[in-house]
Amino acid sequence: MGVYTFENEYTSEIPPPRLFKAFVLDADNLIPKIAPQAIKHAEILEGDGGPGTIKKITFGEGSQYGYVKHKIDSVDEANYSYAYTLIEGDALTDTIEKVSYETKLVASGSGSIIKSISHYHTKGDVEIKEEHVKAGKEKAHGLFKLIESYLKGHPDAYN
């Protein structure tokens, strides 16, 4: 088994407290509302939303995938960080055992820097290259931009 790590950084005009509320704490409600073609719905299968919680995300009609399950590893509201592991679903191939994600929002001027790290745990000696994860990164960035646009258009939301 190998582990391949990829890092991304994005910037936003939205400050960390507001962005974290929308992008992490209320994403299960907000994303299906603003991007139903991407995420149809999200549900908690076990847990209370904190570490150890198992969620099932059902993708929308526009997605190539049906669903994924992920386990929340940590939620740190004070430091605007969130980590979860993709543990089941058709986004996991026969070569990938799991994918762990870490996201941290850092204040930058009046906005944020979003730091994201993905750890792909492969089966056997399979190698994951950056181009293999590029499409997923682009979709995630597009979803992030939708959330950012929503917050810009709804200045009273998530304050």
UniProtKB/Swiss-Prot annotation:
Keywords for this protein: Allergen, Pathogenesis-related protein, Plant defense
GO CC field: cytoplasm; nucleus
Gene Ontology molecular function, alphabetical: abscisic acid binding; protein phosphatase inhibitor activity; signaling receptor activity
One of the GO BP terms on file: abscisic acid-activated signaling pathway
InterPro entries associated with the record: Bet_v_I/MLP, Bet_v_I_allergen, Plant_def-hormone_signal, START-like_dom_sf
Family: Belongs to the BetVI family.
Protein name: Major allergen Mal d 1
The organism of origin for this protein: Malus domestica
Higher taxonomy: Eukaryota, Viridiplantae, Streptophyta, Embryophyta, Tracheophyta
